[in-house]
């Protein structure tokens, strides 16, 4: 084996890229399916190939991208979008705290990309990863996040192209965002041992809907849910602990 072959064999970037691909493969189906749904949804709203592709590349936040898509065709309401995004993505704060050590300054500039691409799946894979000692941990986590990012962007691009090339009937596909949130709510309901916070959210939304009307109830509802849950967080945590 000559010197160049030895250098190539010992290249930490190449080794990490090869090792992480099989680890990320189980996520392909989910990322591509949701990405394709997002691309088709964007097509139904009248946006071309570049919009979903660039939004998937730069926003990279699943359900937030569906919100952004709807916001692009809705009356300008940045406060509503901001509040919804904060509520949906608040869990990222806890992901970030959990990954402080793994994503520390010791891995160099790669940490900025890792922080930017910290989504549910990359958190799960990188947090639970049993990285072989001969691999560079920073590059390993970097490529896990990169592959997931690529799967999502490809899915969004493919979905929009399919919406253009194939004779899909896209009427009603805009309901997919509503369906997405219904599925998330149902999943949390089934997994949760206590439904108090979910019932509070539904109750507050219903009250404001009846009082203010459907045109303006969203922002008061979000603020109300945040205030009530903040005031009751200690009681809710105690109740959850007793159910474990």
From Swiss-Prot:
Any one Gene Ontology BP term: L-valine transmembrane transport
Principal subcellular localization: membrane
TM region(s), chain numbering: 21-41, 44-64, 66-86, 139-159, 165-185, 199-219
Alphabetized UniProt keyword annotations: Cell membrane, Membrane, Transmembrane, Transmembrane helix, Transport
Protein location: Cell membrane
Keyword Nuclease part of the UniProt annotation: no
Pfam families, alphabetized: AzlC
A Gene Ontology term for the protein's cellular component: plasma membrane
Membrane topology: Multi-pass membrane protein
Top-rank lineage group of the source organism: Bacteria
Record family assignment: Belongs to the AzlC family.
Protein name: Uncharacterized membrane protein HI_1738
Species, as recorded: Haemophilus influenzae (strain ATCC 51907 / DSM 11121 / KW20 / Rd)
């Amino acid at each position: 084996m000559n010197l160049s072959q030895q250098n190539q064999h010992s290249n930490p970037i190449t080794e990490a890229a090869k090792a992480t691909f099989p680890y990320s493969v189980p996520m392909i189906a989910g990322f591509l399916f949701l990405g394709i749904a997002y691309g088709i949804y964007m097509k139904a709203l009248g946006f071309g190939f570049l919009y979903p592709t660039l939004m998937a590349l730069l926003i990279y936040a699943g359900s937030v991208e569906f919100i952004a898509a709807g916001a692009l065709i809705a009356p300008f309401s940045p406060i509503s979008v901001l509040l919804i995004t904060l509520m949906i993505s608040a869990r990222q704060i806890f992901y970030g705290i959990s990954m402080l050590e793994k994503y520390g300054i010791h891995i160099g500039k790669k940490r900025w990309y890792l922080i930017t691409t910290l989504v549910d799946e990359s958190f799960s894979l990188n947090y639970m990863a049993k990285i072989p000692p001969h691999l560079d941990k920073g590059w390993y986590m970097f490529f896990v996040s990169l592959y997931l990012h690529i799967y999502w962007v490809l899915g969004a691009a493919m979905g929009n192209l399919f919406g253009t090339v194939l004779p899909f009937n896209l009427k009603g596909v805009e309901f997919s965002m509503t369906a997405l949130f219904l599925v998330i709510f149902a999943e949390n309901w089934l997994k949760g041992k206590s439904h108090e916070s979910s019932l509070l959210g539904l109750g507050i939304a219903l009250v404001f809907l009846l009082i203010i009307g459907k045109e303006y109830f969203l922002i008061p509802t979000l603020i109300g849910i945040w205030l009530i849950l903040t005031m009751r967080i200690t009681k809710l945590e105690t109740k959850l602990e007793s159910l474990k």
